[in-house]
């Protein structure tokens, strides 16, 4: 029997912008970085976008985009931040989806409800809005309709599936 494994990356960071300043303020707990988005981007997102493959002598042989080999979703608020603050990582995520389509016929990326709201607890209108906004943001960034959607905290009920 052939067996398969699917590794899925769920990438989400909440919006950290101060709405009065329209800027992310310094977060001391993220030191030495300015804020947690920057720290996580430098320590996690960028290294996976440009992962080093070493040769037998420990020298860099090539760089690979790990995102092209996994299933992943990136929250719309994080994608917006990446587009502005780490455009190389944003583009690597979009390119990973293109590479997966070329290799397998199916994209690696899936959508996520827009604001990470627990959809079963939302009103019907808010639930539909979260799903529509998440799907639309995905279409604008990845250039295709999503084939699936990551549900925040994997919370699900029948009305959520119907949304």
Please provide the spans of the model-predicted regions:
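Carbohydrate-active enzymes and regulators
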Residues: 1-163
């Amino acid at each position: 029997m052939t067996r398969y494994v699917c590794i899925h990356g769920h990438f989400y960071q909440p919006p950290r912008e101060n709405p009065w300043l329209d800027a992310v303020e310094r977060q001391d707990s993220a030191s030495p970085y300015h804020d947690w988005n920057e720290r996580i981007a430098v320590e996690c997102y960028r290294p996976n976008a440009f992962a080093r493959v070493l040769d037998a002598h420990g020298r860099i042989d090539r760089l690979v985009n790990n995102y092209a080999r996994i299933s992943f979703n990136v929250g719309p608020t994080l994608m917006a931040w990446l587009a502005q603050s780490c455009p190389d990582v944003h583009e690597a995520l979009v390119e990973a989806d293109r590479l997966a389509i070329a290799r397998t016929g199916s994209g690696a990326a899936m959508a996520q409800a827009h604001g990470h709201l627990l959809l079963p607890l939302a009103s019907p209108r808010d639930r539909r809005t979260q799903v529509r906004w998440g799907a639309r943001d995905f279409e604008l960034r990845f250039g295709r309709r999503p084939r699936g959607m990551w549900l925040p905290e994997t919370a699900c009920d029948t009305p959520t599936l119907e949304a």
